[in-house]
Amino acid sequence: MSTTHDNLILAGDIGGTKVNLGVFRAGKTKPLTVIRPETFPSRSAPDLETHIEQFLDRHHIAQAIKSACFGLAGPVIKGRAKATNLPWIVSETNLQKRFGWPKVKLINDLVATALAIPLLNSTALLALNRARADRQGHLAVVAPGTGLGKALVAVGTNQMVPVASEGGHVGFAPANQAQVRLWRFLHQLFGHVSQERVLSGTGLVNIYAWLRDAEAMEPAAAVEKALETAEYNAAPTITEKALAHQDTICQRALTVFVEIFGAIAGDWALSTMARGGVFLGGGIPPKILPVLRTGDFMTAFCAKGRFSKVVANMPVRVILNDRAALLGAARYALMS
């Protein structure tokens, strides 16, 4: 690969299940272009540095990288982060020492996703309602995947400022009697029942376990087999069986999941007054589009009592581009 006249950026989207790495070419008059994207299972290496080293060696581009930025699922404090769902501690200082890049930045993965939103075209977004965006309104991002992430993009005069949060770890508020029973079931297991316990890949498995163990629904053989291997393997199986209408407990689990998703997204939209739009990111939303479009999501999203009309006028979009966070990380490296 020729790199003579390129300003090459290494970007990463570091999640609990997978690591996305990509090299971007940045020109003064051209948009960011990814030229070497690759995905790895997160736990296939002992740390992020090993993933990066293998990636650079495979593509023979270590010397061409001028800057790097990594969006990581977890709080980033003073250039250092402990991954929420991985046994990794990552720091800008250690990365710079190991690889010798002039510039290295760590940011929250939802900040990376938020930074990508202005760069996404219409084919990368799916509308769940007909509300129109206020160009001066804030943007909200809610992203269930291995965990649950949230971010705000504060919009001011001629600027957009992404703000990280750990809102996925606030308490889960049940919206009906069935969800109260779910909360009680999880409270016995975990004590504090965060939103991530019900709105994530693991959250879907938790809902399934509640239906099986506390609501006396017949277990699904395929899910039970997946659970024997590893808990994180069960969520895709539940989703697959539910979307194919092959198992009642899986269908019910996904319905409850979507209702909770709508309520939590609506809460975040109202908390941030996201008149510029609510964007659903993460790995799960694109995989469950048929159930997101049934109306259950938007009904729960808008069920905000006296403020129902306020949230109903906020546009809701699903991010379909699975490299959005990677693109946002590259954009941050270019900006900084």
Where are these regions (language model features)?
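Short glycine-aspartate micro-motif
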Residues: 9-13, 65-69, 105, 131, ...
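ATP-binding/phosphotransfer module of carbohydrate and carboxylate kinases, centering on a glycine-rich
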Residues: 1-60, 64, 181-336
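ATP-dependent carbohydrate kinase catalytic cores
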Residues: 77, 103-134, 228-258, 263
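Active-site nucleophile and cofactor-binding loops and adjacent substrate-binding regions
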Residues: 40-42, 83-87, 105-112, 131-134, ...
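Short beta-strand-loop/turn "lid" adjacent to the catalytic site in phosphate-handling enzymes
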Residues: 59-106, 111-124, 141, 286-290
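Glycine-rich phosphate-binding loop of actin/hexokinase-like ATP-binding domains
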Residues: 124-196, 289-290, 296-302, 306-311
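A short secondary-structure junction signal
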Residues: 117, 151-155, 210
